[in-house]
Amino acid sequence: MGGSASSQLDEGKCAYIRGKTEAAIKNFSPYYSRQYSVAFCNHVRTEVEQQRDLTSQFLKTKPPLAPGTILYEAELSQFSEDIKKWKERYVVVKNDYAVESYENKEAYQRGAAPKCRILPAGGKVLTSEDEYNLLSDRHFPDPLASSEKENTQPFVVLPKEFPVYLWQPFFRHGYFCFHEAADQKRFSALLSDCVRHLNHDYMKQMTFEAQAFLEAVQFFRQEKGHYGSWEMITGDEIQILSNLVMEELLPTLQTDLLPKMKGKKNDRKRTWLGLLEEAYTLVQHQVSEGLSALKEECRALTKGLEGTIRSDMDQIVNSKNYLIGKIKAMVAQPAEKSCLESVQPFLASILEELMGPVSSGFSEVRVLFEKEVNEVSQNFQTTKDSVQLKEHLDRLMNLPLHSVKMEPCYTKVNLLHERLQDLKSRFRFPHIDLVVQRTQNYMQELMENAVFTFEQLLSPHLQGEASKTAVAIEKVKLRVLKQYDYDSSTIRKKIFQEALVQITLPTVQKALASTCKPELQKYEQFIFADHTNMIHVENVYEEILHQILLDETLKVIKEAAILKKHNLFEDNMALPSESVSSLTDLKPPTGSNQASPARRASAILPGVLGSETLSNEVFQESEEEKQPEVPSSLAKGESLSLPGPSPPPDGTEQVIISRVDDPVVNPVATEDTAGLPGTCSSELEFGGTLEDEEPAQEEPEPITASGSLKALRKLLTASVEVPVDSAPVMEEDTNGESHVPQENEEEEEKEPSQAAAIHPDNCEESEVSEREAQPPCPEAHGEELGGFPEVGSPASPPASGGLTEEPLGPMEGELPGEACTLTAHEGRGGKCTEEGDASQQEGCTLGSDPICLSESQVSEEQEEMGGQSSAAQATASVNAEEIKVARIHECQWVVEDAPNPDVLLSHKDDVKEGEGGQESFPELPSEE
C-alpha cells in the first residue's frame, strides 16, 4: 500500500507504522494471554457450577433481529472524497449498523458491491456547520493556524439546505445533504443510533474472549499510567487495538507530517485526514493478522489447560479464596482510607446528579409507550377492524427502531453533560458520553421488551369479540406498565452502580498504585505452580478494589431506593403482577448447584463458611427477599418429604452431609438455618421458631405420596389423652431442667382435638418436635447416626395452625403432655419390645414410613450441630438421658376409636422389622 501512486505516505513512513504496530502487538500479547487463561478458567467454573444471573426481569426479552434487517434506506446526496463532488446515492443501513452507499437503488437490488461502507464507531453526528468546524479544528493541531488569516470559506460547499456531518477520529469525515428538515432529522437520529450501538455492543458481549480482551486493554493502559475508562474503547476488538496503536503513533505523525504540509487550511486539513485514514487502515490490517494469530496461540494453550482446570476446580477456587484473604488484609486499610477521603463524600451528590436525567429519560420512554398503545386502542375502538389492528401492532413493534420518535427520550439523558461537568476536574472523568450512550442503549432495550411483551400478552385475545379485545388492550397495557416500572428501577440502579464505580475507581487505583501494587509480587508464592495461568495477583487485587467501591456505591443506591427517589424500588418490596412466562427463563437448570436449597440458604445466612457471595446483589432479588414476610418451610429448617425407599431392615441409613452451605446428597432437599451465629440451637432446631418471630401462616405445599395421608386421616378419629400418672414426671422435668414452661400443661389439655386428626404414621414427627427441647447427648457425636430421633418433651408450645391448613406439610404441632411413642428403630433407650407391643395393642401404629425420612435426617444433622453449641447443654444432657429413659416406659396411648385393622397390620410388620434391626445400633452406657 505504501508504495502505490495513490498513497500519501512514503515507503519509509509505512515501514515505520508497520514496525510500531508490530511492537504494540508484541507488548500487548502477554497481557492478552494472561487474561485469556483467567477468563477461560472463570468460564469453565461458571459452566461447572451452572451459575445463573439472578437479576429479576418481568418484561419478556425481545429476540434479536434477524441478520440483514433493514433499518433505513433512502436516496440522498453524499459528498465523494475521491472526486471531490456531491453525488446522489442510495444509502442502506442494516442491523449491523454499517452505512452502505450504492450507485442507485437498482444497483442495490441486483446485489452490486457498495460504493463505500462506513462503520461510524467512535464518531459524532452533527447537523450544524459551525459545530462541525469547531470539532474538526480541535482535532487538527495546525502549526500554521495562528499566523493565518481567518478562513471564511466552508470546508464543504453544501448543495442543499439541511446537512448531516459524521465526524470520525481516524477516518475521513462523512457529509450528507437533504432538501427537507424531516429527512435530515430521520437520518441524523439513525446515525446516532448506529454510533451508540457500535461503540458499546462489543463491551456487552458475555463471551470469555471479549472479557479477556477488555481486561487486557485495561491492564495494558495501566502500565502506561492511564487509569479508568478510555473514550477510544469503541467498536470491535480490531478497532480498539488499532486505536491503542494510533494513540502511540499520533504524536509522531503530527510532529513529522503537519509542518511539511503546504496550501490553504482546508487543503491541509483534507490532506491530514487522508493521511490519518491511510495510516489507520494500514494499522487495522496488521492488527487483524496479529490478533488472529495471538488468539490461535491462546486457544491452543487453554485447550491443554482445560483438563487441569476441570479436575482441579475446587483446589483452584480454594487457592484463589486464600489469596483474596491475604491481599485483602494488605489492601483493605489504605483502600478504605482512600475511599473515606476521596470517594464517600461525593458519592451521594454524584448519584443525585445522575438520577435526574436518567430517570427522566426512562419516564419519557414510558410516556411514549403508553401514548402509542392508547392510539392503537382508540383506532380499534373506532374501526373495530382486526386487520387494521394487526397493522398497528406491527408498527408498534417497530417503535424502538423509530429513531425520530425515540430521540426526545434520548435527549433527556443529554443533560448529564451539564450536570456532571465537575467530574472532569474532581475525578478526571471526561468521558460522560460513554455513560450517556450506554443509558440510551438501555432505554431502547427496555422499549423493545415492553412492546414485545405487550404483543405477546395481547395476541391470544385478538380473535375474540371486538369489545373483549378493547378491554384486553387496556388490561394488558396496565400490566406491561407495572412490569416496566419495576424493570426500569432495576436497570437504572444498574446504570448508577456502573457509572459510580467507573467514575470513582481510577481515583482509588491511582492512590494505591505506589504503595500497594509493588507489594503484589510477594503474594505469587501462594499460587500453586500448576495454577499460575488461572490465578493472577493483579486480577485479584483489582477485584478487591472493585468490590470495596461497589459496596460503597450500593449503600447510597439503597438509601435512594428507601427514600423512593425517582420511583426507585427497594429490593425486598412486594413485586408487581408478572406474566406467567416472565420468570420461566430465570429458573436454574435441573441439578444446578446455585439453585439448590442449601446454596440459597447459605447466600442469606450471615457467617456461612465457604460462601463466595460478593455484594453485587443489589439487583439480585431472591424469593426470600421478595417476600420476607412469608418465610418458607425450607427457610425455617423444615424439609420437604419426598417418596423414597424405606430404610433397610437393620434400621440403618446412610446420610451424606457435607459443609453447611453445600447441598445434602439425599432424597430430601433441605435448607438448614441451624448455623445462625449467636442463636441457641434449641430455638432453631427442626420445627422451632425464634422468640421474636411469628410462626408462618402459610407454608409451601410439600411433596408427598399422593393422597395417602389424607385418606388415612379420614379413617382415624382417635384422640390422645394425657395419663394422670405422667404428671409427676412432667413436674420433675420442669423443676430439674426448666425445659418445659408451666403454661405447656394448660396448652396441652387444649390440644386433644387437634391431635385426634394426626395419623399415627406421623408419630415420629412428634418425637422430632419433642426431642428438640432436650440438649443432645454428648455420646451421640461419637457414633453413626441413623434411624429416628429420641423422645423428649417440647421446649415451647409451637404454632399448630399450619398443620390444620396444610395437612401434608411437615408437622410443627406437638402431642400433648407426656404422651409419646417408642420408635422401633431407637436403640439408645434399651430393649423396649414389651412397650412396643403394648403400644401396638393400644392402637398406636409404629413404622418406618418414608414420609418421615427427612425429619429423621434433618434432626440427626441438627443434633450434631446443636451438640457443639455450648458446654452447658452438654453437661445437662446426662440428666436429660435419665429422664428420657424413665419416660420411655411411661408412654401410653388411649385410643377411643379403633383404626382400620388393615392399616394396623401393615404397620405391625414394620414394627417387627424395626425391632429386628435394633441390634445393629450400639447401646448407650447406663447413666444410673
Curated annotation (Swiss-Prot):
GO biological process entries: negative regulation of protein phosphorylation; positive regulation of protein phosphorylation; positive regulation of translation; response to endoplasmic reticulum stress
Polar residues biased stretches: 580-596
The keyword Lipoprotein belongs to this UniProt entry's keyword annotation: yes
Residue numbers spanned by region Disordered: 580-600, 618-654, 669-707, 723-877, 899-928
Alphabetical UniProt keywords: Cytoplasm, Lipoprotein, Membrane, Myristate, Phosphoprotein, Stress response, Translation regulation
Biased composition annotated in UniProt, kind: Low complexity: 801-818, 865-877
Residue stretches of biased makeup (Acidic residues): 690-701
Miscellaneous remark of the record: 'Niban' means 'second' in Japanese.
Name the record gives this protein: Protein Niban 1
Gene source species: Homo sapiens
Taxonomic lineage: Eukaryota, Metazoa, Chordata, Craniata, Vertebrata
Name of the encoding gene: NIBAN1
